[in-house]
Amino acid sequence: KRQPYKQPIYYYVKQEPVTVTPEVEKQLEGRVLVDGEFSFKIKEVNENKSLPSYEETVTNKNGKATFSKLSFNKVGTYKYTISEIAGSDANVDYDAMTVTMTVTVTENSKGDLQASVKYTGEGGFKSSADDKIFNNYVVAPVKTKFDFSKALAGRELKAGEFSFVLKDSTGKVLQTKTNTKAGVVAFDDLTFDNTQVGTHKYTVEEVIPENKEAGMTYDTMKAEVTITVTKEGHVLKATNTLPTDTEFNNTFTPAATQAQFRFTKRLEGKTLEANAFTFELLENGNVIQTKQNAADGSIQFDPISYATVGTHTYTVREKAGTDTNID
């Protein structure tokens, strides 16, 4: 007997999609990493430019940047790029590395989808072929300072009596300092940050006062200072280049003055006559003037002029005569 035809029944088992969670690591050198301070973008590499590409941006948390799960329901190879979005902090060196995430989706013997993930790093601060750690560096500022000196001829130097300015290349006064009693002119630290790598020029000058001290000659030297800021890795270094002459020299010339010595000669038992006695004026043992008495007994030496500050010691003595009746 002929059996009636039976329609075959086909059963389809729907494959479950396989999921992958993209994740990279974040490290910061120089200070403590704060959650949410750095941003990362994942973007699908789509060979068909006309199709929209998947994108997502997240921030770091607990030292990682974790993106949303990606679902795959088809066997194939899928590529994504992960990069850090450079921030605006000028004192941070941001890692420009690009990480390519390759997802290979296959079907196992049971017909289930499975995925393998491979990360490769390129550019930036890449340390290995499979690097997926984004390393940022906080670049600490560098400080440097320098001194000049002050010398004064003609009298003793006083603390704080002369002023000096430090100017930048535009002529703007950055600092004003005075000398110590020992003649040191010390300027404060100059600080340079990550944006100031390069050459910086300055000028140091003595301030010439409007009301100049009488007898003072001021040094008009304009001393040029060059500071070169370089970067080795992520560390700043400052090198100072000072001129050969770093001493400001002033000269004090006091107004000329005079001194004149007058003495009196007395003679007992006899009338004093003019020019009867001779007197010598000595300095440092050397006779510098010789005078005789007047009839009234006065002895007057010539005026002595002084052009410099100092101490002078003199001796006046009577030159012995030949009259044996006079002691």
Model-derived regions: residue spans:
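Solvent-exposed loop/turn and edge beta-strand elements of beta-rich ligand-binding domains
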Residues: 1-327
